[in-house]
Amino acid sequence: MEPTITIENIVASTRLAEDFDLQKLLDTGLKGAVYNKNKFPGLVYRIENPKAAFLIFASGKVVCTGTKNVENSRIALFNLANELNSIGYKGIYLKPEIHVQNVVASANLRTSLNLNAVLSAFGVENVEYEPEVFPGLVYKLADPRVVVLVFRTGKLVITGGKCPEDCEEGLRIIKTQLDNLGLLY
């Protein structure tokens, strides 16, 4: 059975205004928002539908994280723009341009791996493996530009993609390489 990708998190960003007065946002009705400029320069705000968290910065930029697909990131950011507009905040861009910054996915090869053998077979050019520091092997692919964390259990974490297809291609590449080297049992 072929391993499948599970999208764990999408990080997307946009600009929703020229700037924000974060204290004013907090005071005017973003219920549940948290802002402590001494600890973090942004306001943190969460919504439930779709489930997402936002980092809202004084520069007008917003980072959305926690969604499981790109469409939900778009919906969450549009919902935030509409909510800011509805509480009376002026100058909100209601049709923001959204940029996916990172896609994090997981997969399971359903077999255990000898990471020392993987390191030997892959070479050290794009691979880091220091089990006394981190239990996973870190494999950096050039195209697509993703990082695959490989664990001895056969579980993978793929990060750095700009779209889900980057993560799928990263999985295909590493599975093919492991298979061709006889490292999948």
Swiss-Prot record:
<comment type="similarity">
    <text>Belongs to the TBP family.</text>
</comment>
<comment type="function">
    <text>General factor that plays a role in the activation of archaeal genes transcribed by RNA polymerase. Binds specifically to the TATA box promoter element which lies close to the position of transcription initiation.</text>
</comment>
<keyword id="KW-0805">Transcription regulation</keyword>
<dbReference type="GO" id="GO:0003677">
    <property type="term" value="F:DNA binding"/>
</dbReference>
<keyword id="KW-0238">DNA-binding</keyword>
<dbReference type="InterPro" id="IPR000814">
    <property type="entry name" value="TBP"/>
</dbReference>
<feature type="repeat" description="1">
    <location>
        <begin position="7"/>
        <end position="84"/>
    </location>
</feature>
<protein>
    <recommendedName>
        <fullName>TATA-box-binding protein 2</fullName>
    </recommendedName>
</protein>
<dbReference type="GO" id="GO:0006352">
    <property type="term" value="P:DNA-templated transcription initiation"/>
</dbReference>
<dbReference type="GO" id="GO:0140223">
    <property type="term" value="F:general transcription initiation factor activity"/>
</dbReference>
<keyword id="KW-0677">Repeat</keyword>
<feature type="repeat" description="2">
    <location>
        <begin position="100"/>
        <end position="178"/>
    </location>
</feature>
<dbReference type="Pfam" id="PF00352">
    <property type="entry name" value="TBP"/>
</dbReference>
<dbReference type="InterPro" id="IPR012295">
    <property type="entry name" value="TBP_dom_sf"/>
</dbReference>
<dbReference type="InterPro" id="IPR030491">
    <property type="entry name" value="TBP_CS"/>
</dbReference>
<keyword id="KW-0804">Transcription</keyword>
<dbReference type="GO" id="GO:0003700">
    <property type="term" value="F:DNA-binding transcription factor activity"/>
</dbReference>
